[in-house]
């Protein structure tokens, strides 16, 4: 089967990951001890995408949990599904990375990385036909960003032909958790551009907005935010895990969404988002799902798709619905808002339909868009980076761990190149074919 090995790193990654395993276990009818209590055969038919069956038909997540300090892991272990993980798959150090990318990537993280890779190998070997890896991490801290990107590049070396999907929480525009976020994020993006296949970009502020505006939660907790993220994570792979009429997998997604190899940073969204109290009063239709799905307020990262154009997009529907209706709605969106789609990629929306909806809903949809507007986010981080780097603020923490200023300059220019690539394709039109083709060859 098409297995996916899940890796979570750092505090943010571990908290998102823990929530994700609650959601997936629930979907497959697995209780916190790993016993199957489901009422349907479909839940177990392809459960081995995310779970390994151990002795006594216990299901164990194919999850690897890593951190440079034991704190978050202890709280995962004492959480609702803490006992379901394989104890050997908790890999942690004692020192912590202290929000320092260099510690995660070069010093502390580098010492721990071999033990993580051993666990990765063990998990990969127990797979029948490994499809790829999914990594949860944040780009603002030290472990998730520094050690996370180190692990991604090591896995890339060892499994060059497997998909590498990341769920990356980027620093938010208004709320900052650490002062050195712009440094950590820029250094991480520098790595992700080269080594990841698909990056789902998330950020806390956009998630907070969804909780406030749409879900009407007055004081959203990180648990609420992580729940939104895990809905998307489960939606992306539901086609692998449940039978459907139009299937998608990580590789099909990549082929349909990535027109140019470096432009693999996606906005994601999930529908229906309704406040907890009003859920049962709404019957959903495909047009309603579609409308909410393309809504800018629904995007889980702080970039506005209306400020750019979609290169490609993918809609993953779940539930019993007619594929004809799905296709009509998708076509409808493209025809009505044609200026928001680049005209040199015709029919650039891929859709897939999976028959089994998530718990408690009749139908749902997950949206993944490759929009040039994501450059807003990179621009924002880059400006903050430049402001600090110009004065060499906080740089001694990084050079003290053996980093070179050169590396910062490289990361900065790589990020700026990425922004201008997005801009170039946003401005490109189908008529300029001649000069456009020539530009490409020079690069």
Swiss-Prot record:
Keyword Magnesium assigned: yes
GO cellular component, one term: microtubule
UniProt keyword terms in alphabetical order: Cytoplasm, Cytoskeleton, GTP-binding, Magnesium, Metal-binding, Microtubule, Nucleotide-binding
Biased composition (Acidic residues): 429-443
Major location category of this protein: cytoplasm
Region (Disordered): 421-443
Domain of life, source organism: Eukaryota
Localization per record: Cytoplasm, Cytoskeleton
Binding site for Mg(2+): 69
Any one biological process term the GO annotation gives: microtubule-based process
A GO term, aspect molecular function: metal ion binding
Residues involved in GTP binding: 11, 69, 138, 142-144, 204, 226
Protein name: Tubulin beta chain
Species the sequence originates in: Polytomella agilis
């Amino acid at each position: 089967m098409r297995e996916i090995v899940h890796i979570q790193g750092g505090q943010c990654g571990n908290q998102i990951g823990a929530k994700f395993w609650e959601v997936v276990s629930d979907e497959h009818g697995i209780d916190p001890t790993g016993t199957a209590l489901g009422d349907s055969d479909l839940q177990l038919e392809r459960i081995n995408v995310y779970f390994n069956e151990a002795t006594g038909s216990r299901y164990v997540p194919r999850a690897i949990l890593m951190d440079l300090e034991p704190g978050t892991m202890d709280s995962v272990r004492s959480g609702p599904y803490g006992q379901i993980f394989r104890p050997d798959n908790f890999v942690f150090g004692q020192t912590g990375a202290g929000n320092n990318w260099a510690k995660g990537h070069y010093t502390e993280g580098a010492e721990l990385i071999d033990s993580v890779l051993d666990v990765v190998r063990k998990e990969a070997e127990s797979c029948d036909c490994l499809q790829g890896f999914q990594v949860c991490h944040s780009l603002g801290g030290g472990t998730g960003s520094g050690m996370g990107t180190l692990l991604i590049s090591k896995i890339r070396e060892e499994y060059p032909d497997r998909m590498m999907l990341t769920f990356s929480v980027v620093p938010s525009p208004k709320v900052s958790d650490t002062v050195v976020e712009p440094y950590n994020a820029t250094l991480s993006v520098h790595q992700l551009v080269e080594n990841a296949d698909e990056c789902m970009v998330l950020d806390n502020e956009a998630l907070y907005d969804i909780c406030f505006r749409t879900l009407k939660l007055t004081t959203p907790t990180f648990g609420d935010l992580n729940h939104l993220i895990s809905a998307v994570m489960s939606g992306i792979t539901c086609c692998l895990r449940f039978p459907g009429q139009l299937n998608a997998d990580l590789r099909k997604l990549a082929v349909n969404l990535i027109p140019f190899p470096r432009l693999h940073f996606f906005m994601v969204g999930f529908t229906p988002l309704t406040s907890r109290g009003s859920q049962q009063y709404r019957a959903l239709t495909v047009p309603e799902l579609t409308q909410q799905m393309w809504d800018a307020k629904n995007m889980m990262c702080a970039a506005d798709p209306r400020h750019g154009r979609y290169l490609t997009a993918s809609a993953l529907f779940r539930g019993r619905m007619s594929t004809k209706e799905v296709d009509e709605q998708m076509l409808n969106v493209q025809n009505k808002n044609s200026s928001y789609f680049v005209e040199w990629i015709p029919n650039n929306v891929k859709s897939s339909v999976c028959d089994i909806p998530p718990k408690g809903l009749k139908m749902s949809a997950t949206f993944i868009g490759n929009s040039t507007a994501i450059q807003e986010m990179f621009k924002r981080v880059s400006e903050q980076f430049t402001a600090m780097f110009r004065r060499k603020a906080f740089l001694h923490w990084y050079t003290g761990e053996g980093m070179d200023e050169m590396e910062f300059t490289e990361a900065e220019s790589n990020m700026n190149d990425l922004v201008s690539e997005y801009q170039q394709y946003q401005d490109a039109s189908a008529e300029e074919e001649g000069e456009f083709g020539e530009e490409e060859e020079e690069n």
